[in-house]
Structures are given as structure tokens and as C-alpha cells.
Amino acid sequence: MRKMSKRQQEILDYIVAQVKLKGYPPSVREIGEAVGLASSSTVHGHLDRLEKRGLIRRDPTKPRAIEILLDKPEEDHEAIVHIPVIGKVTAGFPITAIENIEEHFPLPAHYVGNENVFMLTIDGESMINAGILDGDRVIVRQQNTAENGEIVVAMTEDSEATVKRFFLEDQQVRLQPENDSMDPMYFDNVSILGKVIGVYRTIH
């Protein structure tokens, strides 16, 4: 039998991760969104191949009836979730960043738990004192509130998104860079898109 394709492995990893996280398998639509496949028929095709390999079993009468049949013990398969990577945030001089999903990035499920998260790529050096460097990917938990001092993704009044440390002072919002050479930004109002809960960095 031919080696399982990368896409089939992604789908299998996602199903395993969702069963571990939620206790039930994802729908075909959710699988497609997680691995970047718009066509449900394409997803069904990959599921057919996984079923022929004896890795899953499906009940065609039910939308979520996918049973995992793995030869290896469950603990040998670390749960993986595919995090959407959304646009790009400039740290320093903000640019419009909330665009369509660019890709999905695999992470161990225990990194994010049951949180609703996304990732953004940092472009700039305004957060270097917080250990967030140019080119890093930050892991962001979606939420619309923040406590003083938390690092957030905020949408400004000019519809620009940026990563900064949040402070509410005298009915005014201060977005504070973590770079001694940069000045704070002040706004009457901002929209909180999420709180930064982690950083992913590739060492070249």
C-alpha cells in the first residue's frame, strides 16, 4: 500500500486531536476548514482512503460518526491541532492585519488546550523586551477584553491591528511597546481581538 499522504496525515491528526479535546469527532466541514480544503467531496475522498487503510471507520448515516482505528496505542499519537494563521501584524508601525486565513499551523494540542486561538506573524521590533521578535508567530486566544499589563492584539480606531501591552488610563487606552526606543500609543477606544498566550519561533 502506498505511503499515506501529508494531507491524509493532517486529517487523521486533526480527527484524533478533536476526539481527545471534545470527546467526539469533527464534521466534514470542520475537517475541511482545519486543513484548508474548501471542497467537501475532497475531504470525503481523503476519508475514504483513511477508511480503506483501516485507520478509521465511518457510519454513512451520521454526520460525525468517525471511529478511530489505530494500530499503535493511543498514547503514541500525540494530539495535534491546526491553528489558523491570520494575516500579519506589524509590531511598531501597525498595518491592517486581520485578513483571510493564510494557512493552518500544526501545534500539540496540550499547548492550547480547549482555547479558541489563532496565530499572527510579527513584523517589527516593538515587542523585543517582552521576548517577541521580528518574524515570531504569536499564539492568540480570542477574547474582547483585557486586563492592564496584558499583551494583546488590538484594532485601533483607524482599523489597524497591532500587538502591544494594554493599559486603560483615565478613560484612554495606552498601547505600550516593549522597546525602549519607541513611544506609547494613545487612543480613545480600541477593540481587543485577543490576548497573546504564547510565541512560536524558528531558529535558523
UniProtKB/Swiss-Prot annotation:
One of its GO terms (biological process) is negative regulation of DNA-templated transcription. It is an enzyme of class 3 (hydrolase). GO terms for molecular function: DNA binding; serine-type endopeptidase activity. Residues 28-48 bind DNA. The keyword Metal-binding does not apply. Pfam families: LexA_DNA_bind (PF01726), Peptidase_S24 (PF00717). Its EC number is 3.4.21.88. The record marks 91-92 as: Cleavage. Keywords: Autocatalytic cleavage, DNA damage, DNA repair, DNA replication, DNA-binding, Hydrolase, Repressor, SOS response, Transcription, Transcription regulation. The active site is at residues 126, 164. It catalyses: Hydrolysis of Ala-|-Gly bond in repressor LexA. Belongs to the peptidase S24 family. Homodimer. PANTHER family: LEXA REPRESSOR, LEXA REPRESSOR-RELATED. Represses a number of genes involved in the response to DNA damage (SOS response), including recA and lexA. In the presence of single-stranded DNA, RecA interacts with LexA causing an autocatalytic cleavage which disrupts the DNA-binding part of LexA, leading to derepression of the SOS regulon and eventually DNA repair. This is LexA repressor. The gene is lexA.
